[in-house]
Amino acid sequence: MEQVVTELHAQGFETFLCGMARGCDTLFAESVLAVQRRCPELRLVAMIPCPSQPDAWPEADRARYSRLLAACSEIRVLEPSYSDGCMLRRNRAMADAAALLVTVYDGGPGGTAATIRYARQKGKQILPLWY
């Protein structure tokens, strides 16, 4: 993913939004921070659905999340507490704010599929890393 971030930076992208979920979001955030060491103008913006997002995660994942949050240029908390649909609303807020969506998607149903559909409806550019 570092190569993707490097290529996007070469195209003029400097601000990267991240939902901070486990898995690909975490890898993407780490990639932005790695490239930021060479290109300090890069900004990582955490888009968190609610403060309790990591509460049920294993301790190692919570620690990794905390380290990543501490390194973010900005943290946007979208809702004060968990509620049904807050993850979807976070995803839509990211799609609304983004010029380009970098996606990792296996073709199955769920939040990623819904966000890709939403972004397409909004005319957003999508860069799929895996379909």
Task: Describe the predicted segments one by one.
Residues 1-131:
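Acidic/glycine-enriched connector segments
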